[in-house]
């Protein structure tokens, strides 16, 4: 099976024959080239057709001809702004900045605005400062004025760290506001304005309320040296030992002489105040032993010989080992992270790097087609190879050489590979080619049925079912029947264009997003499934629909990938659709094994899961054989988090059958 359908290969041949000038091919071929991303930069004459095909095509036009509204739509449908979309966005930056608060929010998330841009927006009253601060307070690094009501309203909606940053940029910050925010929202008053507070009792209250936040550093100097204040803080520190507050210890060290601290705290003074104190481990009191063990990381750093001796002492005396303890004991406020970004992590061996290598080799010596084909073969499953090749800076002759190879790529449908010792037909290449061929047909079908109630739907697939009501209305999720009934309903909803991308508390973790979009899922499967016990896996019956979204609303930009690796929005949504069905399969099996701890008749249950999914999709007379070795693989999946390759293979077989059935090619 060819990677591209015949009409797409024919259109690409015409483009190659015209020296890659898309304006010189027929309008029929132009539309095909646009639909399959078989193009580079685009001419003005194809603007409407390209935008209608996929809004992200806006980035491939000269910036001066682009409509600002189209740029906005492109930004809304992206995860990352690549160099092309960034260029057209910056060209129209002034127009975008006055296109409304939501557009400004997008531009901030994509890092398209400078600090001076934000200052201009506030000074010109285009957007309110509070709006920008709620998006990302750290972007504002210049002084602003806010009313008390605005400050209080803002504090309700931003993290603690952002509030502390806000204190530093306000012109009109005063002590009353800081204290009010502390009382009402429990945000530490760590600001120089606190030094104006001379009420010793209030200062003590604040320091002891926030012992980890170094409020002590902002206390009035007269209060800090008050004997009563010193004694109260020391009593507070002593009361909470062996827990240590580094900031308070530093304060005590600054107001009490070393000799007095050593006399009172002895070996504890090493960890608390970084003082030198020598002693034998066998002379320690029980209280001191507990303190040293809890704070062993301090001794590892400040008095390693003693720490080693203490470990040996405990091993001999109590026959137990004190492990190394390390970590950052300083509390840090984490800045909010956006799903959107302008940063794209570059692969070490990207397609662009390889193309440049081929181009240089061509110029210096003769390069055979066989060599080029071998070098780029690792990108066989990438549907965007043609577009990325045409957008590259290599010579046109090299581009044509590569495109001729890509045009004739075939999926390896008959290749045999060993998975867990089982010889199986490798269908992954065929499935990927099928999705590339038919994604628009599948998308058209799913959008045609997404508004139908599945219990009363009269579509051709529902009419063929033996059971058309919701199966899981009354089900026991502790049983196989309950799990299968819920899976049946989930899959029926999916076939009617409604999916749950977040079934286990993780999004897009299945094999298709990983293989098609080069997603790097470093987490083991058992780590991905860590919240399965409290996830939407517990939802069944009529409540299922509340957890679903239409396939048309499944945001393809949620895939954390370079947009250059996504063919178009419809393609990404169909990949998400089939990937979600595989996730349903894997999650159902994993839930039975781990949550229910049921390992009986695993092979039989896996077979039931696969056939339940096909039945829910209206595929009633297909059979998939499951090998006995599935049981060992699933044990490894649960115990070690290893990827269940054979189960993935079986699941891909299932979606291949479903895809053929939807497309009418089965």
UniProtKB/Swiss-Prot annotation:
GO cellular component entries: membrane
Subcellular location(s) of the protein: Membrane
Pfam families named in the record: Pox_E2-like
UniProt keyword annotation of Ubl conjugation present: no
Alphabetical keyword list: Early protein, Membrane, Transmembrane, Transmembrane helix
Membrane association type: Single-pass membrane protein
Principal location listed in the UniProt entry: membrane
Transmembrane segments: 574-596
Induction behaviour: Expressed in the early phase of the viral replicative cycle.
Similarity section: Belongs to the orthopoxvirus OPG074 family.
Descriptive protein name: Protein OPG074
Organism (species): Vaccinia virus (strain Copenhagen)
